[in-house]
């Protein structure tokens, strides 16, 4: 069954004419300016200072440095908590494990480690208190 070319043109025009364009679901609105947008404002990138200074040596013998990166339970703290880079965190974990094996650091939390810290804190907090002016001792006559 052959359809003539003129009939084909007519079919095409009829089909296109009866087809309706899709209606938009919501009216299109221009984007709001940044001051009128809802939600959280954009955060500016903030550079955090590292707890390890450039001159510090990450080593199993440097216990004063390593001790800052261990929790009270004796666990190694995460990178987020420590605020160190990936390379520094890897070196820290290796140094902590070496210090534990050589028994410089305990595997579990001990009282001795935290008693030392408490003593240091007490010494710092027992600084001289300023006397109030109204309560001075009067010299004896």
From Swiss-Prot:
Q: What is its main location?
A: plastid
Keyword terms of this UniProt record: Chloroplast, Plastid, Ribonucleoprotein, Ribosomal protein, RNA-binding, rRNA-binding
* Family matches, as Pfam families: Ribosomal_S18
Biased composition (Basic residues) is annotated at 35-51
Annotated GO biological processes are: translation
The record's SUPFAM superfamilies line, in alphabetical order, gives: Ribosomal protein S18
Listed under GO cellular component are: chloroplast; mitochondrial small ribosomal subunit
Bias class Pro residues marks the residues at 24-34
Q: Where in the cell is it found?
A: Plastid, Chloroplast
User: Which InterPro entries does the entry link to?
Assistant: Ribosomal_bS18, Ribosomal_bS18_sf
Annotated TM spans: none
PANTHER family from the xrefs? 30S RIBOSOMAL PROTEIN S18, SMALL RIBOSOMAL SUBUNIT PROTEIN BS18M
* Similarity comment: family membership: Belongs to the bacterial ribosomal protein bS18 family.
User: Which protein is depicted?
Assistant: Small ribosomal subunit protein bS18c
Tell me the lineage of the source organism. Eukaryota, Viridiplantae, Streptophyta, Embryophyta, Tracheophyta
Q: Which gene encodes it?
A: rps18
């Amino acid at each position: 069954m052959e359809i003539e070319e003129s009939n084909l043109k007519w079919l095409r025009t009829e089909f296109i004419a009866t087809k309706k364009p899709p209606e938009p679901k919501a009216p299109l609105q221009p984007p709001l300016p940044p001051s009128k947008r809802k939600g959280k404002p954009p955060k500016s990138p903030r550079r955090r200072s590292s707890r390890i200074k450039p001159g510090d040596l990450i080593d199993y013998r440097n216990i004063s440095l390593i001790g800052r990166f261990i929790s009270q339970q004796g666990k190694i703290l995460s990178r987020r908590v420590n605020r160190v880079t990936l390379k520094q965190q890897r070196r820290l974990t290796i140094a902590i494990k070496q210090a534990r094996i050589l028994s410089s650091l305990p595997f579990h939390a001990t009282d001795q480690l935290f008693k030392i810290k408490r003593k240091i804190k007490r010494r710092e907090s027992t600084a001289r208190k300023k006397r109030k002016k109204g309560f001075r001792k009067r010299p004896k006559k």
